[in-house]
From Swiss-Prot:
Keyword ATP-binding on entry: yes
Gene: radA
Full protein name: DNA repair and recombination protein RadA
Keyword vocabulary terms for this entry: ATP-binding, DNA damage, DNA recombination, DNA-binding, Nucleotide-binding
Functional note: Involved in DNA repair and in homologous recombination. Binds and assembles on single-stranded DNA to form a nucleoprotein filament. Hydrolyzes ATP in a ssDNA-dependent manner and promotes DNA strand exchange between homologous DNA molecules. In addition to its role in homologous recombination plays a critical role in maintenance and/or replication of some plasmids, but not in plasmid transformation.
NCBIfam families registered for this protein in UniProt: PRK04301.1 (NF003301), recomb_radA (TIGR02236)
Pfam families: HHH_5, Rad51
Native organism taxonomy: Archaea, Methanobacteriati, Methanobacteriota, Stenosarchaea group, Halobacteria
Alphabetized SUPFAM superfamilies for the sequence: P-loop containing nucleoside triphosphate hydrolases, Rad51 N-terminal domain-like
Gene null: resulting phenotype: Decreased growth rate, loss of homologous recombination, increased sensitivity to DNA damaging agents such as UV light and ethylmethane sulfonate (EMS). Loss of maintenance and/or replication of pHH1 and pHV2 (but not pHK2) replicon-containing plasmids.
Molecular function per GO: ATP binding; ATP hydrolysis activity; ATP-dependent DNA damage sensor activity; damaged DNA binding
Annotated Gene3D superfamilies: 5' to 3' exonuclease, C-terminal subdomain (1.10.150.20), P-loop containing nucleotide triphosphate hydrolases (3.40.50.300)
Organism the protein comes from: Haloferax volcanii (strain ATCC 29605 / DSM 3757 / JCM 8879 / NBRC 14742 / NCIMB 2012 / VKM B-1768 / DS2) (Halobacterium volcanii)
Keyword Nucleotide-binding: yes
GO biological process, one term: DNA repair
Amino acid sequence: MAEDDLESLPGVGPATADKLVESGYDSYQSIAVASPGELSNKADIGSSTASDIINAARDAADVGGFETGSMVLERRQQIGKLSWQIDEVDELLGGGLETQSITEVYGEFGAGKSQITHQLAVNVQLPPEQGGLGGGCIFIDSEDTFRPERIDDMVRGLEDEALEATLDDREMEGSIDDEETIKALVDDFLDKIHVAKAFNSNHQILLAEKAKELAGEHEDTEWPVRLLCVDSLTAHFRAEYVGRGELAERQQKLNKHLHDLMRIGDLFNTGILVTNQVSSNPDSYFGDPTQPIGGNILGHTSTFRIYLRKSKGDKRIVRLVDAPNLADGEAIMRVQDAGLKPE
């Protein structure tokens, strides 16, 4: 959105428009979904002025009013579904990972949560006819789990048809049987994954803001950001805020972080995939004592909640625990050297 457009909002002159753009609010829509306190702090303007600007931006962007159910249905046609390339899992999830939503995957260590983030960082780059979204990926890494070598394995592990279609889509010459061609393709996949390591919870929150800027820069390019992975969402919050005395502050910061991520999904039609750690409830005498970290804040904010469990060997059980429009259920997949594969 051009700066002159922002100046048409009440109370926005050239100086204020500059502050808004510098703070990442360069469109009506990005201003419309901001809170008055957030806009006031980042753009250094009064809270009353910020409220007026936000209300005017909502009118200009047609955001925040009531819609009919049919209008919502029409808008939902724009939502993308990212295939896991595993029919059983895709069927469980109603077609795959949904954009404009937060999908949480939780499970014990070694269950394969990071493997899912790597695989979907590859799959999102596939052409739509192959189940991808033809877009790039942002990867916020809080546990030092991102491995380029794993991306290499998973690209090579794609079906021949998907590899051929990807070469054509990127207008790359060569054969999938040629090692130099595959190396070049792997490099091209890696170039479209933007990785940042989060050193603590404050840095992780800052990286979400940077991710919004990066997604905005790529919005009108050939490779828009269609997937944002956070692996893991809760590790730093869990380590830094210990005990009941700090629980309220932890949950407040986690809540803000989740809403920042959701905003990216809404603004840029991006799928948000977060992994979560678990704890064991010693008071549970019946059923599975494994519980996800994050409490009700994360439970309410996640649109889709997946519990990943180990089974025999390389088998993993993908259990859909919560979804607004899908029944609970399970699917089985395998975690192999070539990536995630059907049973």
